[in-house]
Amino acid sequence: FIAKLGEIIRDKDPKKDQDLRFNACHVLGRYAKWRQLDAQEIITDAVLDTSFTRYIRFQLITAISRTYELMIPGNMHDDRKIIQTLIKLLDDSDGGVRGYAHIILKKGTNDVGKFGFNPGHNKTDRQAAIRRWNDWASQVTAPLLSDNFIKKPQK
């Protein structure tokens, strides 16, 4: 079932209904949310494919955001590919994709951590902020029992 959804998403036949692909992204995101690693892999690979329309890429970002939101209260080590993918999207050629990925990433920092990122800046100006996002990611995705693990404050 998951493989079939992946086929629907990756099928770039322009005659295919975009809404069918959109819905496949949505359903696959539901599976990915519950640690279905094959579903996560399909989504994280597809969202980086710049040949997809913004419409589909936004739905793919929404799909991985569900998994990311479940990761926020706990350790992010096991699903670190989701965070790494969102950070890669900060350097995407599409400013809308960069901005949406940034909105999702900020949720993991309680909207505090912007790290100076502005999706409208040019590639060179974005690099310092992306390095700060990568530094943050290396801390929050550290294995739970490692020396690098940062304990999150209780609310």
Positions of predicted regions on the chain:
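Short, solvent-exposed loop/turn elements at domain surfaces
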Residues: 13, 98, 142-146
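Short inter-helical turns and helix N-cap capping residues of alpha-solenoid HEAT/ARM repeat scaffolds
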Residues: 13-17, 51-53, 93-94
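Short amphipathic alpha-helical segments that mediate assembly, nucleic-acid/protein binding
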Residues: 2, 21, 39-40, 57, ...
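Terminal, low-structured helical/coil segments at or just beyond the last alpha-helical repeat
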Residues: 114-155
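Structural detector for internal amphipathic alpha-helices that build alpha-solenoid repeat scaffolds
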Residues: 18-35, 55-76, 96-110
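Amphipathic alpha-helical scaffolding segments comprising HEAT/armadillo-like alpha-solenoid repeats
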Residues: 1-10, 34-48, 70-89, 112-118
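Charge-rich, solvent-exposed alpha-helical interaction surfaces
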Residues: 4, 8, 27, 42, ...
